[in-house]
């Protein structure tokens, strides 16, 4: 089984090996799954929706697609499943948190302190209120970029996870969640895609 493969249109999926997620005080088993290394980009989303309007900020092809509501994110997954012939979906909250923590037990995947956080997280203190290039921060131990900060990410349960470039660093974390209406769009909301192995 490969650790990564490239899929149309250019989404890189990393294998997240199964394990046990600690959610609150509970241990929850997690089956292996694939998760995109980065949130879906403008050029990837435009392949699904050519009429997609990019953020008003300067926006490159490989910048994250923002302003996407839950139904659009789910629609992208369904479309991607058809063109790739692979069952794609949004990650569950448990999968998302497990992938974010990357089997670490500290507050952040890089430790309990925010010292050095700027190497891993785009947040309100280091992002000049513009969508930052998410691939420019270091990945977590699972090889995933911008799991914390960057953009809020939709999950299958319509809950946003992780915080964004507008969130103060102290309010960002793998367990951070935000409940919004499914039609909520903002220039700090994006999404990743996932695929089960079975």
Give short role names for the model-derived ranges.
Residues 21, 40, 95-97, 165, ...:
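Short, solvent-exposed loop/turn segments at secondary-structure junctions
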Residues 2-54, 67-71, 149, 195:
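A short glycine-rich, aromatic-capped structural motif
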Residues 59-62, 68-187:
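Functional-site microenvironments in short loops/helix caps that host divalent-cation chemistry
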Residues 10-13, 27, 32, 131, ...:
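A residue-level signal for beta-strand positions that form part of recognition/binding surfaces
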Residues 6-9, 34, 46, 109, ...:
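Compositionally biased, intrinsically disordered low-complexity regions enriched in proline and serine
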